[in-house]
Amino acid sequence: KYAVIYFMAAVYFLDSMLVTRYPSEQLISCIRYTATIFFALWMVEYYDGEKLFHLIAAAQVIFTCLTFAFMLLRPGAVFSQEQGEHDFTGFLRTKNNAASQFSICILLQIAWFRILRAKQMIVSRKYLLSLLAQGIFLVLCNAKGAVLCLIFPLLYVLFGKYKEEPGKRLPLGVIYVTLSVAFLITALTILPLFQPLFSLIGKDATLTGRIPLWRQIIQVMINRHTFTGYGYGMFWRDRQAVAMVHQAFSRNSFMGSMTTGAHNVLLELWMNVGLFGVAAYFTAMIISTIGAERMEWTGYLFSAAYILWFMVFGWTERSMSTYEYQTLFLFIAMGSACNKQRVGPKRRQYVK
């Protein structure tokens, strides 16, 4: 049942090892990525959707407590130190890192609360207080993109009829692929027409310089390694490849020295595993989510909440590093979507 995910992992592994200029580092990167996938699928096999939500909520309570502790120990370090900014970062490196952490976990906790409500169970006070604190932290981050990532999937979590009407569940894979590609095309063609709307939220039509970067990346990838990429996680390690991106920008500008990613999940994948890898990813996403009406509703809720959030997040941010919680959650979501029937090892029973 997970064959399509295994296929994608195999494509990434084989492609990366064949094209990389750094075989030792590439092997480590591929092993880490594969281990993340296997761990995600192991969790899907042994925990149902409700338990997965519970584990994430419990982990986020710990994260919130650690954030408060860090604030007490180093109060001057929890806000951005860059000139002209005073955005909350907690103990993470940037406001966007912190905001994405709070954004996705707020969403998944609210989804868990809906499950508990359906079972007429009361939410523990510690989870409610943790959620409130995370909401305040998210506002302090002043990261509007993370809030936008939260809105659309949150509306579906709260008002969707996925439990009562399984036949009307969303085709998650098709939506993900279609809107992700459509966003890139729109951003590169007609987005400047919407400058007045972006001005209302304090942004510009270049998405803070992302669009010129995307155009240059596309130009680089059309000319070199179009179908194979540079190896998973290796593009930004390759000095020649990075130099080709930088040459379109002033040497003294941020983009002329930036090595922190494409700020778009699909472009980042293209750079690393080429069009073959992107095609394998799209195939895995679409096939794994076919037949959503046959999924256990709590598992579907996890898949829907995370895939919809990750879709919007991936429009303007990078992700899918070899081992990070966003990558782990993605393959838990895809694995849950594959798990249409209860087969294999018996799931552990949820005990409150």
Predicted regions and their residues:
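Long extracytoplasmic/lumenal interhelical loops at the membrane interface
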Residues: 201-215, 219, 223-273
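Transmembrane alpha-helices of multi-pass inner-membrane enzymes
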Residues: 107, 111, 154, 303-352
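Flexible juxtamembrane loops connecting transmembrane helices in multi-pass membrane enzymes
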Residues: 86-91, 169-170, 184-216, 237-239, ...
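Aromatic-anchored transmembrane helix interface
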Residues: 2-13, 22-45, 55-58, 65, ...
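Transmembrane signal-anchor hairpin modules in multi-pass inner-membrane enzymes, especially those
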Residues: 1-14, 48-54, 113-125, 293, ...
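Hydrophobic transmembrane alpha-helices and their immediate junctions
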Residues: 121-126, 155, 159-162, 168-171, ...
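Alpha-helical transmembrane segments of multi-pass inner-membrane proteins
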Residues: 53-79, 93-162, 287
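A membrane-periplasm/extracellular boundary helix in multi-pass inner-membrane enzymes
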Residues: 69-73, 140-141, 158-203, 219-223, ...
